[in-house]
Amino acid sequence: MENIEYAVSALRSGGIVAHATEGVWGLSCDPKSEQSIKRILEIKGRSKSKGLILIGGKIGYFDQELLCVTPDKRIEIEASWPGHHTWILPNANNYSDWITGGRETTACRVPNHEQARNLSLQFGGPIVSTSANLSGSPELKSEDAVRNDFETLVDFILPGAIGGANGPSNIHTLDGSMLRSSLG
């Protein structure tokens, strides 16, 4: 079995997978598995109220959310994907409060990282992706660092390397403001 198949199997069975993204390593799980989401939040020491990002292997995974925005905004969002840009979109798929942080929105991205996109594509839909770090600590940028900190806490570490970005993704709102800006 290939590494990506092991990772997908872990996700489908409610596990947590560490994997590389554009600028940092991430922790992923099935967005419909409340137990897995709780585990990620516990591992990170992260508050449920912050919400989590969903990454998708293709733009079509976010069609329902994109139907809720203006045609001009949809063009802008689609032009930024795949890319290092997360967008705060209407929660059209009714993801749980564990994903949305209790808001009526969902953070969505199609990453500019082939392995991260492929993980979602092989899974068959969006997956949770949050930085592999303890809340308030620096994001991890190497597989060795992830193995040192998370090997006993996750179900699978997908071998790989981050892309060329310098940190976590930019986070954009529909009104044009930026909640987080990355140098990458």
Model-derived segments and their meaning:
Residues 1-184:
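Active-site-adjacent structural elements in enzyme catalytic cores
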